[in-house]
Amino acid sequence: MTRIKLNYFVIGVVALLLALALWPNIPWRNGQEGQLDRIKARGELRVSTISSPLIYSTGKDGPSGFDYELAKRFADYLGVKLVMTPHHNINDLFDTLDSDDADMIAAGLIYNSERLKRARTGPAYYSVSQQLVYRLGSPRPKSFSDLKGQLIVASGSAHMTTLKQLKQTKYPDLNWGSSVDRSGKELLEQVADGKLDYTLGDSVTIALLQRIHPQLAVAFDVTDEEPVTWYFQQSHDDSLYAAMLDFYSEMVEDGSLARLEEKYLGHVGSFDYVDTKTFLSAIDNVLPSFRPLFEKHAGEIDWRLLAAIAYQESHWNPQATSPTGVRGLMMLTRATASGLGVKDRVDPEESIRGGSVYLQRLMQKVPDTIPEDERIWFALAAYNLGYGHMLDARKLTKNQNGNPDSWVDVKMRLPMLSQKRYYPSTTYGYARGHEAYNYVENIRRYQVSLVGYLQEKEKKAAQHAAIEAELGKAYPVVGPGWSINN
């Protein structure tokens, strides 16, 4: 799955021009109270969304997700509190706009012309294609004419519109069902589990789900790349809409939008079934032996990220040894281990402790101008490449008018460290920058798989426990010699 990089300059210019065009329709210019005034008086921006790791989710560290962070920044821009409410059904999202229970929708929704009857859209903040999926191992359809089973999509989704258009123009015999009680993500999971033959999904969601459901396979692209947008009420009052366009222009201009996309989508790349399957098997069979050590020595690092680093380094093999002499779970050099007080590099606890301490030292060493949530990627590049070479990549970025404090800019320069055109002018010389690039991207993918897979296991365990508890209430345990009197 290849994603088209959005032209953020074009987005910013379009947003600015639209904001200027809407200027005459802003009520406060005529002394009237507009939607933006009501939001500020209320002190809340009400946003409808759906629950998804990519879009909006809550955990022990609070809410997260691409749409959540973008909406939170918009609320901060307006000077109000964000109130984000998840809904299960896409139709419910638009009902909240119609009933004025929400000011906008931020739910990773594809642009859909049919929705323009009920709402209007904001600028695109990333793009996806619609794809048909099936379960790996079953016959792969090459077109809709090859479908040999049930096709179901989420009610109210853009996929419904796409299928209607295809039936009218190309596949008159095409049939499908729609589900109001299952989300698009749930339908994708049902295909992966063999409970449903086919469904449609967006390319980004599918790519992320494949990290924890590798048997989910893409049959073919149904559409070209399409924009993902927010939705707003249809209204002659343009006050909120104009503020949103101004906000987008600023996000584009200062690089914040590109950095958010990098944070949530930068690791979405090619899918390796065998590697993913092997990793998930290792989570079940190998990780339990080392998980307590990762949790114990993680420090300021998420233990799951530390575990992902160790898997990239050694595949969780404490006896691992490279031709260059690095050894152990965290593949420490003899010199690094000595400096960290690690006496036995193949001792799992010593190796994990040493690797964690070394990485945290690198994070503290990273320049303060780098944002907090991006420091880890610079530190990981330094962990793999050497701190000096990471600084060279930042210098190259600055010389090429990029932002040396932005990981999305710097990572693109890492491969240049091995190119003769560039490395002679660097301070620390030649380095295998392409390996550091792949190193960090692999770790990010492993972390996504690990977090998602463990969450799925915990969710299923909780559901099983709830069912067992209900069964226990319905059928009380009867001990030997006891009797139940009616």
UniProtKB/Swiss-Prot annotation:
Q: What is its main location?
A: membrane
Keywords annotated in UniProt: Cell outer membrane, Cell wall biogenesis/degradation, Lyase, Membrane, Signal
Membrane topology, as annotated, equals:
Peripheral membrane protein
The annotated region (LT domain) lies at 269-486
Output the GO biological process annotations, alphabetical, semicolon-separated.
Answer: cell wall macromolecule catabolic process; cell wall organization; peptidoglycan catabolic process
* Record's GO cellular component terms: cell outer membrane
Region Non-LT domain, residue ranges: 22-268
Enzyme class of the recorded protein, top EC level:
lyase
Can you state which reaction this protein catalyses?
A: Exolytic cleavage of the (1->4)-beta-glycosidic linkage between N-acetylmuramic acid (MurNAc) and N-acetylglucosamine (GlcNAc) residues in peptidoglycan, from either the reducing or the non-reducing ends of the peptidoglycan chains, with concomitant formation of a 1,6-anhydrobond in the MurNAc residue
Q: What is its EC number?
A: 4.2.2.n1
Query: Which Gene Ontology molecular function entries are recorded, alphabetically?
Result: peptidoglycan lytic transglycosylase activity
Query: Per its UniProt record, what SMART domains does this chain match?
Result: PBPb (SM00062)
Q: Which residues belong to the signal peptide in this entry?
A: 1-21
Cite the InterPro entries for this sequence.
Lysozyme-like_dom_sf, MltF, Solute-binding_3/MltF_N, Transglyc_AS, Transglycosylase_SLT_dom_1
Catalytic residues, per the record, are 313
Which cysteine pairs make disulfide bonds?
none
Q: Which Gene3D superfamilies match?
A: 1.10.530.10, Periplasmic binding protein-like II (3.40.190.10)
SUPFAM superfamilies linked: Lysozyme-like, Periplasmic binding protein-like II
* Location of the protein in the cell: Cell outer membrane
Please indicate which superkingdom the organism of origin belongs to. Answer: Bacteria
Domain statement:
The N-terminal domain does not have lytic activity and probably modulates enzymatic activity. The C-terminal domain is the catalytic active domain.
Recorded hits in PANTHER family, A to Z, give: MEMBRANE-BOUND LYTIC MUREIN TRANSGLYCOSYLASE F (PTHR35936:SF32)
Summary of the function given for this chain in its UniProt record: Murein-degrading enzyme that degrades murein glycan strands and insoluble, high-molecular weight murein sacculi, with the concomitant formation of a 1,6-anhydromuramoyl product. Lytic transglycosylases (LTs) play an integral role in the metabolism of the peptidoglycan (PG) sacculus. Their lytic action creates space within the PG sacculus to allow for its expansion as well as for the insertion of various structures such as secretion systems and flagella.
Similarity comment: In the N-terminal section; belongs to the bacterial solute-binding protein 3 family.
Name of this protein: Membrane-bound lytic murein transglycosylase F
Q: Which organism is it from?
A: Yersinia enterocolitica serotype O:8 / biotype 1B (strain NCTC 13174 / 8081)
